[in-house]
Amino acid sequence: MATYFVGDLQGCYDELQRLLEKVRFDPTQDLLYLVGDLVARGDKSLECLRLVKSLGKSAQTVLGNHDLHLLATAFGIKKVKSRDRVDAIFHAEDFEELIHWLRHQPLLVYNAKQNWVMTHAGISPDWDINTAQACAKEVENVLQQGDYCHLLSQMYDSRPDLWSADLTGIERLRYIINVFTRMRFCYRDHRLDFDCKSPVDKAPEELTPWFNLSNPLYKQVDIIFGHWASLVDTPTPHHIYALDTGCVWNNRMTMLRWEDKQYFCQPALKDYAFNG
């Protein structure tokens, strides 16, 4: 039995299949964890959704920002982004089933026994693991059982950008979503920045990657995340595993076997340059 983590798919189905073949993934014994953004700019988002869903308990994803946007478009709240290639999903006979399944995926997966946690973008510098779990559950409860359309319609904002336990209502939920699905850089006072997407060495001096801020959690638990393609080949601290290596940006898809920390890579199999 082996445990595998894989970076953002973004509709790059063929590359995922190559990786699964390379490691001889066996769904009867192995486990596959995905850091979110199953869909968007690649041309096989439908196939990615179907595959992960079909693996049942052998696979577990978390929600990424593109997954949440797909939910918002599915419920008529937002329009499909011009660069996203998700039309096949909306015309699929299993559309409603796929959207229902996606809406019931978590924002965070924590394995206390193996001491790792997985989210799409990261964990707030102001949270411990208990707070992170509780915050994830707050949003998940609304998405799965509450007024999810209202939440999806109100999540598109960058405020508030600083955590407070006193946050309530939609502002609290929005901050939680932004941390788990959009966060990259922060200011040193822990405020979130959503404008800078550049490589770390080209970022403004006042910004720092969230994982370089002071939070005891970052040294206590292994954190696996994706979302940040421009981090590719950038060294990260011990316990921090960044798996988005920009396959849809003509780079590569990365898979990590947890037991021996061996990486497997699959270069992009086609030119996705139209997404630039």
Curated annotation (Swiss-Prot):
- Could you list this entry's UniProt keywords, alphabetically sorted: Hydrolase
Family in the record:
Belongs to the Ap4A hydrolase family.
Q: Which HAMAP family match?
A: ApaH
- Species of provenance: Mannheimia succiniciproducens (strain KCTC 0769BP / MBEL55E)
Does the keyword Hydrolase belong to this entry?
A: yes
Tell me which domain of life the UniProt entry assigns to the organism this sequence originates from.
Bacteria
Give GO MF terms, alphabetically.
bis(5'-nucleosyl)-tetraphosphatase (symmetrical) activity
- Gene3D superfamilies, alphabetized: 3.60.21.10
Protein name, as recorded: Bis(5'-nucleosyl)-tetraphosphatase, symmetrical
The EC code for this enzyme is 3.6.1.41
